[in-house]
Swiss-Prot record:
The chain crosses the membrane at residues 231-251. The lineage of its organism: Archaea, Methanobacteriati, Methanobacteriota, Thermococci, Thermococcales. Keywords: Membrane, Signal, Transmembrane, Transmembrane helix. Residues 1-23 form the signal peptide. It is found in: Membrane. InterPro entries: ArsR-like_HTH (IPR011991), Bact_Sporulation_Assoc (IPR051922), Cell_wall-bd_2 (IPR007253), DUF7343 (IPR055767), WH-like_DNA-bd_sf (IPR036388), WH_DNA-bd_sf (IPR036390). It is a single-pass membrane protein. GO terms for cellular component: membrane. SUPFAM superfamilies: Winged helix' DNA-binding domain (SSF46785). It holds the Pfam family DUF7343. This is Uncharacterized protein PH0614.
Length: 332
């Protein structure tokens, strides 16, 4: 646990060094998101903070009278540029038409799914690129909330990925932003994603996992700190205080989810899984009876059950099968 504060402080120093250049062709007075799913709201937070525009969650199908009254008051004050986040499944064309009929100039940024929407937002608001990007799970809202807080504080774009593999949208975003450093946040991401990024040459750090602190270049002498530097380090301390309960919550949630996940397996299934993982994650099915001591019919039934649960896959190899773990789990 002692490594976590050092890691975060190191990351903040790196973020300060790799400061991103922001370029926005259009400014917006208001950001519209759907009110029945938090994900679009969360990924819009960093950009709302960048342009000082409020976020208004609305009914995705139609504007209710109360919302219309708010919007009428807003446009009368000269705030008429609206950004809708999400495709027409997220916020309908009817809502967009209502906004235009009220006199708003409407821009929509949305993709085929939440990961692509996050990619398009990042590229729209960081048209000059960003050396650092924040990466979170598209389905772990707690991690995305923490990632959004980091992105707000240090002006970095946020991207979303799938749990077990790097989403194509996240990869495109990282490449088009010309990123050098990818910061993964939370427990909703499989370690294979980090390995994929490292294999492609990106420098990665993981907030919410106990890893070694990154190397930080130091000098023997440094100029006197300005008031801006003091404010920056004060901001780091505040960030640590804010994130501490979030990280603790994510850790507890991960432990609970892992416990619930393991409950779906019986003793024999766990024994077979452990045997496969101890041998590098794959083994010949014909060798399993000897390794775990179960009969061939029992092994065949267990492997088929694990395959149905999406934990292993089988590949034909001669007269037997190669059984391969495709979703890594920790078995004590």
């Amino acid at each position: 646990m002692k490594r976590i504060p050092s890691l975060i402080i190191g990351l903040l120093l790196i973020l300060a060094t790799w400061h991103s250049v922001l370029a926005i062709n259009d400014n917006y007075d208001l950001i519209i998101v759907r009110n029945d799913d938090l994900i679009d709201y969360l990924i819009s937070l960093p950009y709302s903070h960048l342009i000082n525009a409020p976020i208004l969650p609305v009914n995705p199908k139609e504007l209710d009278p109360v919302t219309k009254a708010q919007l009428y008051s807003y446009i009368q004050l000269g705030r008429d540029k609206v950004l809708i986040i999400g495709n027409t499944n997220a916020v309908s064309l009817d809502v967009e038409k209502e906004l235009r009929d009220m006199g708003f100039s409407v821009t929509r940024i949305g993709g085929a799914d939440r990961a692509e929407t996050a990619e398009k937002l990042a590229l729209h608001f960081y048209q000059n690129g960003s050396k650092v990007v924040i990466l979170a799970s598209a389905w772990d809202y707690g991690s995305t909330l923490a990632a959004a807080e980091f992105a707000m504080e240090y002006k970095c774009p946020i991207l979303l990925t799938w749990e077990n593999q790097l989403s194509p949208s996240a990869l495109r975003g990282i490449e088009k932003l010309n990123a050098k450093i990818v910061i993964l946040v939370g427990f909703g991401i499989n370690e294979t994603i980090e390995k994929t990024l490292e294999g492609m040459g990106y420098e990665t750090y993981w907030i919410g996992r106990d890893i070694e602190p990154p190397p930080i270049e130091t000098t023997t002498s440094s100029p006197p700190q300005s008031s801006g530097s003091k404010s920056f380090f004060l901001g780091m301390i505040v960030t640590l205080i804010i994130l501490a309960p979030v990280i603790l919550y994510l850790w507890r949630r991960r432990s609970e989810r892992m416990s619930e996940f393991l409950e779906q397996f019986n003793e024999k299934e766990l024994a077979v899984l452990k045997a496969i993982m101890e041998r590098g994650g794959e083994v010949k099915q014909e060798d399993l009876p000897r390794i775990v001591g179960y009969s061939r019919p029992t092994i065949s039934r267990i492997v088929q059950d694990l395959e149905k649960k999406g934990i292993v896959e089988r590949e034909k190899s001669g007269k037997t099968f190669i059984v391969r773990v495709i979703k890594k789990i920790k078995i004590d």
